[in-house]
């Protein structure tokens, strides 16, 4: 599969920038004639993968959403050498289609949870597996792997195009969660079809419950055989990533280029990560790399940034020394040296150029900003490629001779600029591809104040990063009500210098001072800061939000008797925790949307990553259970939930509100029928934001 420059424009269109032509943006439907101004007629088409020979590409349309990331769609193989002739690879919608590196095969899954392979030269389909059912998943994620490991396709082609490795998940022992939906089509609501709710069921392991059993299989494309890899006997937990090492050159005349299968394993508590190398012929695996933390979880996501070099070495990312840094390991898994001994977190790796021996990456120079860097490993010289406060991201061409820089900040929308390599580590600006000046002018015409970043020192002496949006027509001699927005989840960040125009600006336009504070546990401030909330989610975050609110009350333009806190999902949980922990009336009201209310009710992978299992951390679960704090809630409350939420089940809100009733607490509640965790149905989303405004007007 060819690595192209991928450009995500502000309206969400995936396009290609042809590095050789440099001057043009090429739309994914017609790579020879269409420019950025001609995209509107083909917005329904999306590019999935491209073959390394540039002849074929996959496109899909008619997307049918499944869960957060997964979807079924009609996939087409496009032959650029035959006038972009399109061939549908299956007569039914499929998911997670991926093209082999040489463009001769496409692997995908169908609704029966089996894997299939389409042979391009013969235009034929062959079933790779046939044993799947509603509890067996071959090569694709179940709900848990998709939601908490951010992956949908659990398979990978070998670099020689001869084998497909895949993860097999068996959910047979996983408990089932069920919910109902109530709405039929408008015309059918009072017919027989709409008289009875529909029941939906999902295998959903809550904290401490049995997980799916995972195994690794390898399919030989020529012989149509499947082998199961022999994992060590103590391998319990998760297998969220598989890949292959690059082909190595043979040392003898009769040898063929070889590649190892690479398997990432996490134990159940996710505080130990093992990387295995496996021989698909013998099925034997051996340990290549292991990392364990006694104090926290091991960040498996860093594995996605590892760079496997053609000579067998690998650039490993780890936060084992306090910050996310890069290390060079040899082919035997022995550390050779630290590549980036800096006190800042690497946030993304763009890749490694073997010709210049340069590693390109993004790092948090400050927690609120992102800069891009080039590290010449041979010379041990690091160069910052970007300038200016804000967020910088790079998209490189396959030959590492061009990149598109995407820059944005709180005052600058996404601007895309093409750069060209000039040699000796120097880059020259070629042209601004897209500046979104019209969007900037339209935004400025609204007259809304921009975010201002400022520090808050807590009562215990920690310095928290925060931003504020002053009310429209701000007058420093007046006092204003405050709405504190927050998410607060572990490793997350909301205080970032980026172009993120959300609901907070509408609140500022309505006359509120809007503030967001990142407390302990949030990202880009090193391992120890992220460690702070381990085993007791919500407690220290609430301490920080309360301390920040007390500071805001001291400001001359803040009305300390009119303050609110609001959050969604983890932020909703944190809102309830804050209203339960405030010993004095810091906030007069709060809004909790789709909140977790007890970590025993949430899924195993996320919860146990930060809390471990209830069986080993009973005190942590008891001490963060909001049901047990219902009697401590102070201030007015609006609690909101979608009744078809497959992620944070409405069960959380319903059990919690029962506890509030038993404690004699009055509150407001808004339920959205047949809507999920995001409450994305247009009429519901509009209603929700109006409801928030009305609640704040009433209580502040």
Which role does the model predict for each range below?
Residues 241, 248, 254, 258, ...:
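Serine-hydrolase catalytic core recognition
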Residues 6-7, 374, 524, 695:
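General helical structural elements
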Residues 1-4:
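Positively charged n-region of N-terminal signal peptides that target proteins for export
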Residues 7-11, 17-396, 401-402, 412:
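Beta-propeller folds
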């Amino acid at each position: 599969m060819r690595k192209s420059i991928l450009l995500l424009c502000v309206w969400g269109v995936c396009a290609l920038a042809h590095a050789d032509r440099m001057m043009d943006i090429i739309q994914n439907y017609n790579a020879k004639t269409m420019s950025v101004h001609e995209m509107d007629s083909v917005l329904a088409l999306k590019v999935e993968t491209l073959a390394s020979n540039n002849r074929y590409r996959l496109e899909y349309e008619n997307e049918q959403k499944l869960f957060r990331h997964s979807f079924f769609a009609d996939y087409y193989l496009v032959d650029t050498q035959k006038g972009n002739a399109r061939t549908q690879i299956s007569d039914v919608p499929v998911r997670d289609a991926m093209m082999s590196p040489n463009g001769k095969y496409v692997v995908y899954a169908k609704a029966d949870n089996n894997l299939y392979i389409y042979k391009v030269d013969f235009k034929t389909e062959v079933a790779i597996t046939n044993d799947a059912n509603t509890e067996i998943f071959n090569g694709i994620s179940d709900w848990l792997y998709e939601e908490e490991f951010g992956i949908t396709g659990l398979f990978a082609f070998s670099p020689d195009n001869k084998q497909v490795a895949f993860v097999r998940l068996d959910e047979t022992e996983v408990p089932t969660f069920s919910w109902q939906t109530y709405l039929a089509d408008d015309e059918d609501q009072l017919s027989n079809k709409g008289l009875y709710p529909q029941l939906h069921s999902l295998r959903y392991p809550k904290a401490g419950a049995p997980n799916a059993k995972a195994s690794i299989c390898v399919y030989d494309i020529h012989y149509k055989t499947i082998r199961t890899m022999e994992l060590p006997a103590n391998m319990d937990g998760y297998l969220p990533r598989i890949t292959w090492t690059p082909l190595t050159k043979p040392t003898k005349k009769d040898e063929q280029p070889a590649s190892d299968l690479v398997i990432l394993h996490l134990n159940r508590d996710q505080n130990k990560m093992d990387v295995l190398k496996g021989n698909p012929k013998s099925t034997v695996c051996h340990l290549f790399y292991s990392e364990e933390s006694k104090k926290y979880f091991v960040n498996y996501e860093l594995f996605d940034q590892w760079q496997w070099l053609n000579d067998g070495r690998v650039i490993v990312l780890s936060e084992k020394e306090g910050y996310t840094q890069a290390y060079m390991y040899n082919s035997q898994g022995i550390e050779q040296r630290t590549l980036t001994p800096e006190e800042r977190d690497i946030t993304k790796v763009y890749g490694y150029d073997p010709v210049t021996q340069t590693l390109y990456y993004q790092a948090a120079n400050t927690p609120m900003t992102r800069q891009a860097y080039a590290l010449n490993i041979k010379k041990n010289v690091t160069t910052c490629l970007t300038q200016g406060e804000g967020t910088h991201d790079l998209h490189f061409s396959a030959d590492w001779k061009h990149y598109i820089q995407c820059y944005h900040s709180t005052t600058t929308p996404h601007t895309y600029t093409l750069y060209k390599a000039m040699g000796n580590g120097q880059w020259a600006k070629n042209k601004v591809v897209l500046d979104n000046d019209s969007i900037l002018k339209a935004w400025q015409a609204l007259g809304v104040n921009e975010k201002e970043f400022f520090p808050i020192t807590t009562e215990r002496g920690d310095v928290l990063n925060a931003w504020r949006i002053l009310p429209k027509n701000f007058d420093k001699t007046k006092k204003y009500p405050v709405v504190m927005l927050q998410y607060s989840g572990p490793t997350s960040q909301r205080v970032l210098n980026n172009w993120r125009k959300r609901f907070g600006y509408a609140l500022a336009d309505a006359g509120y001072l809007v503030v967001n504070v990142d407390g302990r546990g949030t990202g880009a401030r090193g391992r120890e800061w992220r460690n702070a909330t381990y085993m007791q989610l919500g407690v220290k975050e609430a301490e920080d939000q309360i301390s920040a609110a007390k500071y805001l009350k001291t400001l001359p333009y803040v009305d300390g008797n009119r303050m609110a806190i609001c959050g969604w999902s983890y932020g909703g949980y944190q809102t309830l925790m804050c209203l339960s922990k405030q010993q004095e009336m810091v906030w007069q009201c709060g809004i909790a949307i789709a909140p977790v209310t007890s970590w025993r009710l949430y899924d195993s992978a996320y919860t146990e990553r930060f809390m471990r299992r209830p069986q080993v951390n009973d005190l942590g679960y008891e001490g963060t259970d909001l049901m047990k704090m219902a009697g401590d809630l102070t201030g007015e409350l609006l609690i909101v939930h979608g009744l078809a939420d497959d992620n944070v089940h409405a069960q959380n809100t319903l059990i919690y509100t029962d506890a509030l009733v038993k404690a004699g607490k009055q509150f407001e509640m808004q339920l959205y029928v047949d809507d999920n965790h995001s409450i994305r149905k247009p009429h519901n989303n509009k209603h929700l934001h109006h409801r928030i405004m009305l609640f704040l007007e009433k209580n502040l």
